[in-house]
């Protein structure tokens, strides 16, 4: 999701150029992944109004949504497929955040803005809110559970 701003297009260009530059050197694009991405785009286009966003190649595939459907998670695709939607406020994404969502990756927000967003909208699905690039970083608190407490066996002797 992008937050509406007068510099939005420049921010998108800068962000996606950096993502592409990083990914093209770290990942080998496989034919099956390219097919999965184009299939995901056509499937999404069959159900909603989307625009294909030009990229240098298929390392990252972007679709720009005209509106945000409540079932957007049904159109997820792995390996670098991104659905983008521009909002005026974070509150616009609240209706899609269900218990299926565990982690929210962010960039450019202050911690207190995100805490207020979660509290104001009473979001129940999010267990972790972390900067982009840290969404898969392992921690001892995972999906809202303290793993030490969860996996520690404490025998009792009476």
Where do the language-model regions lie?
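NAD(P)-dependent aldehyde/semialdehyde dehydrogenase
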Residues: 1-105, 112-123, 129-156
């Amino acid at each position: 999701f992008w937050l509406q701003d007068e510099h939005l297009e420049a921010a998108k260009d800068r962000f996606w150029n950096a993502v592409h530059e990083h990914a093209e050197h770290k990942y080998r694009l496989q034919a099956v992944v390219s097919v999965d991405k184009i299939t995901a785009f056509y499937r999404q286009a069959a159900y909603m109004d989307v625009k294909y966003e030009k990229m240098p190649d298929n390392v990252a595939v972007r679709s720009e949504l005209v509106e945000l459907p409540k079932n957007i998670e049904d159109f997820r695709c792995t390996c670098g497929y991104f659905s983008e939607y521009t909002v005026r406020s974070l509150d616009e994404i609240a209706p899609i955040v269900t218990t299926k969502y565990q982690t929210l990756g962010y960039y450019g927000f202050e911690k207190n803005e995100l805490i207020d967003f979660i509290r104001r909208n009473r979001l129940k699905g999010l267990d972790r809110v972390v900067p982009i690039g840290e969404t898969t970083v392992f921690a001892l608190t995972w999906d809202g559970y303290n793993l030490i407490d969860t996996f520690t066996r404490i025998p009792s002797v009476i």
